[in-house]
């Protein structure tokens, strides 16, 4: 019985860990008073958890190391309860443009003191040319 129980827990752990991955919480920047963190969990959906200042806008881009045209971006606006046009993309060295279809669903947008925490979900592949395609396997995002 102990062997069967051990095998069950081993297989359950193996299968549950193989189904998704997480970046863990990553500190992104603390320049000019803009402290940000990001965490990306990938399973059947992508779950993005961002923290940043509540009184400034901040953004996170996927799949690029500079402001390259076509980079998928999420933008958090300062001092707003709603997050209009959260899903955006870059056209080059300019302000991000609102994506025609907002694929991210903001499930939580809270402010505690001076810190805004946003939790949003999205499909791994939206089929939109302006959206980054997340892999179901761990890969660098850039």
Predicted regions and their residues:
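Extracellular-facing/secreted segment signature in eukaryotic proteins
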Residues: 19-142
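Bacterial Sec-dependent N-terminal signal peptides
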Residues: 1-22
């Amino acid at each position: 019985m102990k062997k069967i129980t051990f095998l069950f827990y081993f297989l359950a752990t193996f299968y549950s860990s193989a189904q998704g991955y997480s970046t863990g919480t990553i500190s992104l920047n603390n320049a000019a008073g803009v402290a940000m963190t990001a965490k990306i969990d990938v399973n059947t959906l992508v779950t993005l958890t961002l923290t940043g200042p509540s009184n400034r806008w901040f953004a996170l881009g996927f799949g690029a190391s500079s402001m390259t045209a076509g980079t998928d971006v999420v933008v958090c606006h300062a001092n707003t309860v709603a997050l209009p046009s959260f899903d955006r993309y870059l056209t080059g060295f300019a302000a991000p443009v609102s994506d025609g279809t907002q694929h991210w669903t903001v499930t939580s947008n809270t402010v505690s003191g001076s810190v805004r925490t946003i939790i949003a979900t999205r499909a791994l592949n939206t089929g939109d040319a302006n959206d980054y395609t997340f892999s179901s396997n761990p890969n660098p995002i850039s």
